[in-house]
Each structure stands twice: as structure tokens, then as C-alpha cells.
Swiss-Prot record:
Its cofactor is pyridoxal 5'-phosphate. This is Probable cysteine desulfurase. Signal peptide: none annotated. The lineage of its organism: Bacteria, Pseudomonadati, Chlamydiota, Chlamydiia, Chlamydiales. Keywords: Pyridoxal phosphate, Transferase. Belongs to the class-V pyridoxal-phosphate-dependent aminotransferase family. Csd subfamily. It catalyses: (sulfur carrier)-H + L-cysteine = (sulfur carrier)-SH + L-alanine. The modification N6-(pyridoxal phosphate)lysine is found at K219. Transmembrane segments: none annotated. One of its GO terms (molecular function) is pyridoxal phosphate binding. The active site is at C358 (cysteine persulfide intermediate). Disulfide bonds: none annotated. The keyword Transferase applies. Its EC number is 2.8.1.7. It comes from Chlamydia muridarum (strain MoPn / Nigg).
């Protein structure tokens, strides 16, 4: 049986067992990603898109090939629909600023009442400057978007809807294609915060008719500081640049500069070349695994959910049995602080997340303080889940 952990130095080099269940926050890096970054700095370092010498030409070619890999992974039609950014937050802010500087000014954006801060604050800040309005669509008790309420809001006139593909708190999965159809029926556009969706397997954004999609490389086993904003080509062409600098302008004129076509229009300055190469290596790695990433994570999430249900008094936030769930479970144990559980689990070599998960609106929606979240990555297996649940049960016995 293939041992995925052997591909990751963080697990190979531990003297004591280390169970990492916080991949919703960030994923560890396989050796091939680390090698791609260090090889670039050690043997092929040069800038991209700016010089004619061979080292620059070679690395520029490698850099652009990663756009093709990303496009294939997410199901984009064109490489030019892939804009490199610093991460999901950067992508959403880029889109919010550019849209509010053009066709969104004075209009209306809809987000859900349970979004990550990145998909609320980016819109609220940009819309406040342009005079646009942000409205919130309700979610049900499992965290699933209330489509009838969304339609009611759309009938009032909306330019853009921005929703999470997978909630980082509840794990609720957005029915993307169904939502896209509804949003487009009323003449609006759909943007997706894909931070928790991109790592669960290849996507089909063009088939789902998604207009914009944002994600971070570090949640796809790639380095930090690199992300992607996908946008349909014609929509990216409709947006103005939000940063000025090298390589995003064709002809400078103090009155009427002519800017590059997307994606370069949105990539001012020297990019995070090492991060891009690491992102390409991460996608290569995932595609070469001898099993389906999606099937593995779906089955393991189901196993985690069912094992957690065996713990007395436990409350699992979000979708219940039979409803699609992203690869995470947030839990509450009445009378026990999530931060205490996280601290005690760390003492047993188990890393989980405790807190509000950078989503205070979601905490308010379910009237929660903090939750304990276990989230899965490609390197996790059933034994990790068993060890986590047994450690949790052992800790809880001391409270009773």
C-alpha cells in the first residue's frame, strides 16, 4: 500500500508520531515541491518575462507552463484566465477592488452570513469606497445556502454573488452549478472562495459556469505566498488594473497608458516565481498519486464523521449524515473549552485548530464561541482518525 507520508519530510523526520489534522488552515509540502523551490534558487534563478538571456527564457517558459497546469486542474478554458496572486485573500481583494472601480460601483454584492472574513471584509471595504451595497444570504442550520432567499435577493437587483465553495467552519459544500444557473438567470455574476474546495480534487469551473474562483497554493500542498484568481477571459478583460508597476503596462503615457491584456494586467512587479514553480510541482504530485484524491478524502471524511459520532454529547457543526461535506469536522463538547482540548491534544502529538476559524459571522450564525476543527489532507489515513478520536476520548474522561 502506498505510504503518502513518506513523500512529506515533516512526517518522515519526526521521532515521535505526529498527526496533523489542520490542512484546512495550511497543508504540508511534499519533497518534490520543496525541491522545485530550492532547485530554482540553487540552479536556475532568473527573473521572468523581462529578459532575452537563456536563463530568463527558460524559467519564463517553466513559469508559464504552470498556468496551463492550474488551468487543467481547475477546469479553465484558457491559460490566460489564470492570474497569479498572493493567495485567496489577495485574489478576493483584487476582484473586489477592480470590480468596484468599474461595473460594480453603486451596485449590490451578496455574500452569505457564514463566510470567512476574507470573503466578507474584502467586499465591505471595497464597496464602502464605491458606494456599493453588501447583502447577506441566509444559510440553514447545516450551513447550506438558502436558495429561495438568494433568489429573493437576486430579484431586487444584484451584480455579483460571492460564496465559499466549502465552508471552513461547517464543511457545507456549495451546489456550485445550481447556484451559478440561478445567479446567471438574474443577470448577476458568481465568484467563489475556493480556499477549502481546491484541494479536494480537480475542478470543472468552465463546466459549472463559474465566473471567478479564488484559491491559495498553500492549501494545495504548494508554498505560501502564491495564489490564483480565475476569471472568465472576457470578464478579466472588463476589469481595470489595481496595482501599477513593471510588466503590466504596454505603453506608458501620463494621460492614457495602455495596459497589458490579462493576466499580466493584474501581475504588477516581479512575481513570486518560486511559489509558482512550487504550485506547478504540487499539481504534478497530486496528479501522479496512484489513487483519486477526491475519493480518498471523501471516504476519510465519512470515517472521521462516523467515529466522532461515537463520542457522547458531541455536537458536529454543519451537514449531517447523507449531506455532502468538505474534508473537515468542527465539533463542540458542552462544558469543555475548544482551546483546552486543542492544547491537550497537542501534548499527544495531534495538531487541530481551535477558535473562531477567522469566521466570526459563522460563529454568530450558530451562536457559538469557539469550535475544535479537525481537517484532512492527502497524507492522512484511518489510523490518524482513530488515534485522534481515542486521544479525544481519553481527554474527555478526565472531565467526567
Amino acid at each position: 500500500m502506498y505510504n503518502v507520508k513518506e513523500d512529506f519530510p515533516i512526517f518522515r523526520n519526526q521521532k515521535d508520531p505526529y498527526i496533523y489534522l489542520d490542512s484546512a488552515a495550511t497543508t504540508h509540502k511534499p519533497q518534490c515541491v520543496i525541491d522545485a523551490v530550492t532547485d530554482y534558487y540553487s540552479f536556475s534563478y532568473a527573473t521572468v518575462n523581462r529578459a532575452i538571456y537563456s536563463a530568463s527564457h527558460d524559467i519564463s517558459s517553466a513559469y508559464w507552463r504552470v498556468r496551463s497546469k492550474v488551468a487543467a486542474w481547475i477546469g479553465a478554458r484558457y491559460d490566460q484566465e489564470i492570474v497569479f496572486t498572493r493567495g485567496t485573500t489577495s485574489s478576493l481583494n483584487l476582484l473586489a477592488i477592480a470590480a468596484n472601480d468599474s461595473w460594480l460601483a453603486g451596485g449590490t454584492v451578496v455574500v452569505s452570513e457564514a463566510e470567512h472574513h476574507a470573503n466578507i471584509l474584502s467586499w465591505e471595504i471595497a464597496c464602502r469606497r464605491s458606494g456599493a451595497t453588501v447583502k447577506k444570504v441566509r444559510v440553514n442550520d447545516e450551513g447550506i445556502i438558502d436558495l429561495s432567499h438568494l433568489e429573493k435577493l437576486l430579484k431586487q437587483g444584484v451584480q455579483l454573488v460571492s460564496l465559499a465553495h466549502v465552508s471552513n467552519v461547517s464543511g457545507a459544500v456549495l451546489p456550485v452549478q445550481e447556484v451559478a444557473f440561478l445567479v446567471h438567470r438574474y443577470g448577476a455574476l458568481l465568484a467563489i472562495d475556493g480556499a477549502q474546495g481546491v484541494g479536494s480534487g480537480p475542478l470543472n469551473l468552465s463546466g459549472w459556469d463559474v465566473d471567478f474562483y479564488a484559491f491559495s497554493g498553500h492549501k494545495l500542498y504548494a508554498p505560501t505566498g502564491i495564489g490564483v484568481l480565475y476569471g472568465k477571459r472576457e470578464l478579466l478583460e472588463s476589469l481595470p488594473p489595481v496595482e501599477g508597476g513593471g510588466d503590466m503596462v504596454v505603453v506608458y503615457d501620463s494621460e492614457s497608458s495602455r495596459y497589458q491584456e490579462p493576466p499580466l494586467r493584474f501581475e504588477a512587479g516581479t512575481p513570486h516565481i518560486a511559489g509558482v514553480l512550487g504550485l506547478g510541482a504540487a499539481i504534478d504530485y497530486l496528479q501522479a498519486l496512484p489513487f483519486s484524491v477526491s475519493d480518498h478524502l471523501t471516504a476519510l471524511t465519512r470515517f472521521l464523521y462516523n467515529r466522532l459520532l461515537t463520542i457522547p454529547d458531541i455536537q458536529i457543526v454543519g451537514p449531517q449524515q447523507g449531506t455532502p461535506r468538505g474534508c473537515l469536522c468542527s465539533i463542540i463538547i458542552p462544558g469543555v473549552q475548544a482551546s483546552d482540548l486543542g492544547f491537550l491534544l497537542d501534548g499527544k502529538g495531534i495538531a487541530v485548530r481551535s477558535g473562531h476559524q477567522c469566521s466570526q459571522p459563522a460563529m454568530a450564525r450558530w451562536d457559538l464561541g469557539h469550535v475544535l476543527r479537525a481537517s484532512l489532507g492527502v497524507y492522512n489515513d484511518q489510523q490518524d482518525v482513530i488515534s485522534f478520536v481515542e486521544a479525544l476520548e481519553d481527554i474527555l474522561r478526565s472531565y467526567r
